[in-house]
């Protein structure tokens, strides 16, 4: 039964190892994974980029054109949005800090507890400031984006569809979305390329796997 429904069954450890070691296996990284690099702690994002840069992984990586297209269109706004989220959290923390400090005359707020609170506040605030500075630096220096660009060199990126091909994909995507057939979900985006992005990427992956006989 498992042979008939491979797509619905998890691979065991040996099967997964065999798949990863197969020279015909390609690994596709989605746009969201690339964007998350700008949300992670610097240590974690650097480690993930190190893995993607490793010779073993690099040989297997391939990027559908629309993954790269979506990443390039959204990465700067994503960084700005992350910066704003951190800044908002920082302001809320400062407001909470001020409210607590104003209660210092409360007899139940002991000096040692207040001191611990101030210490914790300073550590969290420093962490927020560090994250904001890292995002500002990324917008200025493009360090991570340059590493991603080198990882996905031109030969590892798919070819853009023609306007005629895109029109046909939009039509088919609309039919599937109307029937609630995955991949993808109708998010109401008026930009058809974004609206049918998951479907377009799926079709490009199918074409790549079929043409190059890849897993």
Segments and roles (model prediction):
Residues 2-214:
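Active-site-proximal, substrate-binding regions of enzyme catalytic domains
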């Amino acid at each position: 039964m498992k042979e008939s429904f491979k797509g619905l069954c998890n691979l065991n450890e040996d099967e997964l190892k065999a798949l990863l070691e197969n020279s015909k296996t390609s690994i596709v990284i989605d746009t969201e994974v690339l964007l998350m690099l700008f949300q992670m702690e610097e240590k974690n994002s650097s480690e993930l980029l190190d893995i993607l840069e490793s010779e073993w992984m690099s040989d297997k990586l391939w990027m559908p054109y629309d993954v790269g297209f979506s990443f390039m269109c959204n990465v700067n706004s994503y960084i700005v949005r992350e910066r704003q989220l951190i800044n908002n959290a920082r302001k809320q923390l400062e407001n909470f800090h001020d409210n607590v400090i104003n209660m210092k005359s409360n007899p139940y707020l002991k000096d040692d507890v207040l001191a611990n609170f101030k210490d914790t506040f300073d550590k969290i605030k420093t962490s927020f400031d560090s994250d904001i500075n890292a995002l500002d630096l990324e917008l200025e220096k493009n360090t991570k984006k340059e590493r991603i660009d080198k990882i996905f060199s031109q030969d590892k990126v798919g070819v853009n569809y023609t306007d005629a091909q895109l029109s046909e994909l939009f039509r088919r995507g609309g039919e599937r979305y109307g029937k609630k057939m995955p991949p993808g979900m109708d998010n109401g985006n008026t930009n058809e390329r974004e609206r049918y992005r998951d479907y377009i990427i799926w079709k490009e992956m199918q074409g790549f796997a079929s043409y190059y006989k890849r897993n």
